[in-house]
Curated annotation (Swiss-Prot):
UniProt GO BP: DNA replication
Gene3D superfamilies: Nucleic acid-binding proteins
Membership in a protein family: Belongs to the inovirus G5P protein family.
Gene label: V
Protein name, UniProt field: DNA-Binding protein G5P
InterPro entries: NA-bd_OB-fold (IPR012340), Phage_M13_G5P_DNA-bd (IPR003512)
GO molecular function terms attached to this record: single-stranded DNA binding
Subunit and interaction comment: Homodimer.
UniProt keyword DNA-binding present: yes
Function per UniProt: Binds to DNA in a highly cooperative manner without pronounced sequence specificity. During synthesis of the single-stranded (progeny) viral DNA, prevents the conversion into the double-stranded replicative form. G5P is displaced by the capsid protein G8P during phage assembly on the inner bacterial membrane.
Superkingdom as given in the UniProt entry: Viruses
Length: 98
């Protein structure tokens, strides 16, 4: 599944401490799944506290991001990880004229 990151900007959502629980902070980045013949599907991808944001470019979803649900179906795990799409870089390079 191909994903595009258009900005390395990170949004932080915070929830204050309450009922004896510490404050919670979520770091998120906007991405989009590219669907052939259809519009891109935007979604947010959670980042770990010390994780640098993904740079602008094309990625694929790491298969380690998938897991089985309790019915044996396939679903995304808690954290989606991206791997740089090296084929996108090759397709963007101009052909050499020789």
């Amino acid at each position: 599944m191909k994903v595009q990151i258009m900005s390395s900007a990170v949004a932080v959502r915070s929830f204050p401490a309450r009922e004896g629980k510490p404050a919670t902070h979520f770091r998120e980045q906007t991405a989009a799944v590219l669907r052939e013949g259809d519009f891109p599907l935007p979604f947010t991808i959670g980042l770990d506290e010390d994780q640098p944001p993904y740079g602008e470019g094309f990625y694929i979803i790491d298969p380690k991001s998938l897991q089985n649900n309790k019915f044996g179906g396939l679903e995304f795990g808690r954290r989606i990880r991206l791997i740089p799409d090296l084929t996108a870089k090759l397709q963007q390079q101009p052909a050499k004229v020789g």
